[in-house]
Amino acid sequence: MPSELRFDGRVAVVTGAGRGIGRAYALLLAARGAHVVVNDLGSSTGGEGADAGPAAAVVEEITAAGGSAIPDTNDIAGVAGADALVGAALDRWGRIDALVNNAGIVRFAGLPDADAENLDAHLDVHVNGTFNTIRAAWPHFAERGYGRVVNTTSSGVLGLPVNLGYATAKGGIIGMTRSLATAGEPLGIRVNAIAPAASTRMGARKKGDDPEMDPALVAPMAAFLAHESCPVNGEVYTAGAGRFAKLFLATTPGHVQGAPTIEDVEAHWAQINDETGYTVPADLIDWSGEHLSHLDGS
């Protein structure tokens, strides 16, 4: 039997940890020995209002079980809130080792109903909030030569017509994750993402409706990505209902032709789309080398 993966002495910050999936993350990390900052603004699923109760309740659960945690209600959509959140970890324990960006909102709408306000609301929390917390924690990770970041994307990036703003924001998380991973690798910082699936209030389904979709079944993947033994960087994993899998971007071999015409594209459409022999680029440089390899005869 493998040895238990522990977080003793580590400090983890979890955003959106007052309910649902974030709560499951915080409880598991604390149970494995981490000091946890339980961040939650306490807003509605659409981002309205604030309530200190959810974060405080999770902290009570953790401490009652013998764990170590403090509540935090800063709004990470703003720079000041994200700075204060990271500052709370530093003030209490003098360090930050792992950051789990789980906070999010959902306002269902697709075109023609979705407007710029809807899009901006999703970007503010999902994209700006994730960026703000990472930016606040990054210097501390770099100084110690160690850091783990777990961002939250969604299977919605595969196509979610009823919530365009949400899917758009979650797509941005993938680009952010992969870019930060390349920057963090030489610094000892690993940045990955999780696409969770569980019954929560955000999905308009409460825990208990589907026992197999319990948020606790997602948490092991997030915890592993936040652990020092995590071997990957810049990757995305789906998690839910007890199933874990890798979600990745790939490119087909395609068709090579000098000075092509529109008609050439049509004529070779099947070859362009043939997924046989696809490759998975590690980053932009890797993709560029592959895409332009025909120019040097390789």
Indicate where each model-derived feature is located.
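Canonical Rossmann dinucleotide-binding motif of NAD(H)/NADP(H)-dependent dehydrogenases/reductases
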Residues: 4-37
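A glycine-rich helix->loop->beta "capping" turn
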Residues: 7, 65-68, 88-101, 107, ...
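The beta1-alpha1 cofactor-binding region of Rossmann-like NAD(H)/NADP(H)-dependent oxidoreductases
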Residues: 52-56, 73-84, 116
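Substrate-binding pocket helix/loop in short-chain dehydrogenase/reductase
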Residues: 62, 110-111, 118-120
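A short, exposed helix-loop element centered on a Lys and neighboring polar residues
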Residues: 134-135, 178
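Catalytic loop of short-chain dehydrogenase/reductase
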Residues: 150-172, 177-186, 195-211
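C-terminal helical subdomain
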Residues: 193, 210-297
